[in-house]
């Protein structure tokens, strides 16, 4: 689930908006003869931004997320991630209530993976850049429905174990989560390629 808050079609230069993304998920596998396994995950990304011009939007998302794996009642692994994102969007007004936009997203990627049987810890850090497109429809002077699709994305992540570099991973993908993702760091949103939300604006 993703929830975004701001207003676009009625926004003017100097307008500010707040909002964010939030998500939670849980998956349990319980075989007929065996021990159940459970994975839970969450994501939270408060957002703030402003309009530099009537059609140029600058925003920042502070991305936090994590997950836990259990086998029976025993925790087997745990992940925590931090992925702040800065973005710039350019809007094109089609009608009084409807606009199209394109956006460029830059994000820092970091995360820690802990294994408990046996004890082990891996860390990763890097960066990502992506291009997205979307549409905005004004429901009222304050509320706007927004949908966005991640077209292209590139990320580069370095992995370390006990402060020793163990590898690097670079990805270039068509169809990406515009608020940050990689195989190690899932970012600050739902991980979805297409996101829909409601925005709210204030002066």
Describe each region flagged by the PLM.
Residues 55-58, 96-98, 137, 142-145:
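Repeated loop/turn-to-beta-strand initiation elements of outer-membrane beta-barrel proteins
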Residues 20-24, 46-50, 64, 86-90, ...:
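Residues on the lipid-exposed face of transmembrane beta-strands in outer-membrane beta-barrel proteins
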């Amino acid at each position: 689930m993703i929830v975004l808050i701001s207003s676009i079609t009625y926004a003017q230069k100097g307008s500010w908006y707040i909002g964010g993304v939030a998500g939670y998920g849980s998956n349990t596998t319980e075989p007929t003869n065996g021990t159940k396994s459970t994975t839970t995950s969450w994501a939270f990304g408060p957002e703030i931004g402003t309009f530099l011009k009537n059609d140029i939007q600058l925003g920042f998302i502070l991305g936090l997320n994590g997950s836990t794996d259990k086998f029976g009642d025993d925790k087997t692994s745990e992940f925590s991630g931090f992925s702040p994102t800065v973005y710039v969007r350019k809007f094109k007004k089609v009608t009084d209530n409807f606009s199209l936009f394109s956006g460029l997203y830059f994000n820092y990627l970091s995360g820690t993976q802990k294994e408990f049987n046996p004890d082990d810890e891996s860390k990763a850090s890097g960066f990502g850049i992506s291009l997205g497109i979307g549409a905005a429809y004004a429901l009222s002077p304050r509320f706007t429905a927004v949908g966005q699709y991640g077209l292209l994305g590139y990320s580069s992540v370095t992995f370390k174990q006990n402060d020793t570099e163990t590898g690097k991973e670079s990805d270039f993908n068509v169809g990406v989560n515009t608020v940050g993702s990689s195989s190690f760091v899932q970012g600050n949103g739902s991980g979805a390629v297409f996101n829909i939300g409601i925005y709210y604006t204030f002066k």
